[in-house]
Amino acid sequence: MTFTEYETVLELRRYTLHPGRRDELIELFEREFVEPQEAAGAHLFGLFRVPSSPDEFWWLRGFRSMEARKEALETFYFGPAWKAHREEANETMIDSDNVLLLRPVQRGLTSPPPGSELYLSLSAPPTAFATFETEPSPNTFPQLPVRDDGPFSVWFSRSASPSGVLLEPTARSLLR
């Protein structure tokens, strides 16, 4: 499977949640927010627990372009699914603004070979199957802030590295 069509612009969203509420948010998110975002033009291909941080939820959302990102986010966040469930989702969160806006260093994000663990790393191991760097374009949807204290580089790999973070896919994560 390739995600090339949707990897032109990538958000790595890292939420800090109130203690003990991660699974509550994941259940709500997977039930109410995946299909509406996909219908709006976003592609959600990674939804993760972070075993070392039980009150964090990380996820990846891709877009064809910055303009497509703007349109998809306007459609979703001003639409019925978010309006119906935003309070419930926001009640689980302490912080949802730790967001990296990224672009591919090399096109061709493909599903890695099957394995039991997936890592996000801040220094590229030789086994990296996807590499991204800060997207320098202005944020086209300022209602959702993105970090501007970069630049950042992010790699995904199947093997651990000293600077990596183990990610555990949720039931609906396409990256496994």
Where are these regions (language model features)?
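An N-terminal domain-start capping segment
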Residues: 2-21
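Short, surface-exposed ligand-recognition loops at beta-strand->loop->(often short) alpha-helix junctions
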Residues: 17-26, 123-127
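Surface-exposed beta-loop interaction hotspot
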Residues: 91-124
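Short, low-complexity N-terminal intrinsically disordered segments enriched in polar/charged residues
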Residues: 1-5, 112-115
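An amphipathic, aromatic/His-enriched active-site/gating alpha helix that lines ligand/cofactor pockets
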Residues: 2-5, 28-49, 53, 62-100, ...
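Short, structured motif recognition centered on aromatic/hydrophobic residues
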Residues: 9-13, 25, 37, 57-63, ...
